[in-house]
Amino acid sequence: MSSVSASSGVPEHTSLKQIEVLVVQSNPADTFLTLAALESAGLTGGLRCVSEGQEALSYILRKEPFANAPVPNLIFLDLSEPRVSGLEVLRVIKSTPALMHIPIVVAAGSEDPDFVRSVYALNGNCFIRKPGELAEFVRFIETCYHFWGSVVTLATVEKVHRKPKKGMEVPGPNS
C-alpha cells in the first residue's frame, strides 16, 4: 500500500528495494540536488557519484580504482559530460551484454529532438529534461527513483554475478 507525499506529490512506497545507484554528473550543484532528491525519496542501498563520462566508464567497467565497486542497479546519467559524452557512456553500457540490463535515466538541459532520439536509439530507459525549478527537479528525481526502486523488478547484482552465461560476464579489472 502506498500513500502520496504532501511535499512532493510522489507516491511514498513502503517497499523500496535496496538498490545500488550511480550518479554521473559533472555539475556539482546538480550532483548535490540529485543526491538530496534521492535521500528525500528514501534511497535504500548504496549511492555512488562520478563526475564525468570517462570516470563513469572506468567505474562501470570495473577498472582501477573501481575494480571492487558494486555494479549499479540504476544509473542517473547527465548528457553533458566533458571528455567522454553521456551518449558514449550510454552506448558502451548498453552494448556490453553483462551491463545492458541496467536502467539508465538520462537527463539533459534541453529536449532537443535529436538528443532524445539518440538516447532511445541507444536503448536509454528514460529521458528527462532538467527543469529550471528546483522543486520540479527534485520531484522528477524522486519519481524516477520510486519507479525503479519499487514498481519494477530489476536484475540484481547477485544474479549477474552468480553464474553468468558465456559472454555475459561483468568485466573485471584486467579487462
Show which residues each predicted segment covers.
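Active-site residues of response regulator receiver
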Residues: 77-79, 108
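Short, Asp-centered acidic motifs that coordinate Mg2+ and/or phosphate
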Residues: 74
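Non-catalytic signal-transmission and effector/linker regions of two-component phosphorelay proteins
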Residues: 1-48, 54-55, 61, 65-71, ...
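Short amphipathic alpha-helix used as the core "switch/output" element in two-component signaling
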Residues: 87-100
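Acidic catalytic/metal-coordinating carboxylates
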Residues: 52, 85-88
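Negatively charged, flexible loop motifs adjacent to catalytic sites
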Residues: 27-30, 82, 98, 110-114
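Alpha4 helix (beta4-alpha4-beta5 surface) of REC/receiver domains from two-component response regulators
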Residues: 35-36, 88, 110-128, 132, ...
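Residue-level signal for the "D+5" position in two-component response regulator receiver
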Residues: 49, 81-84
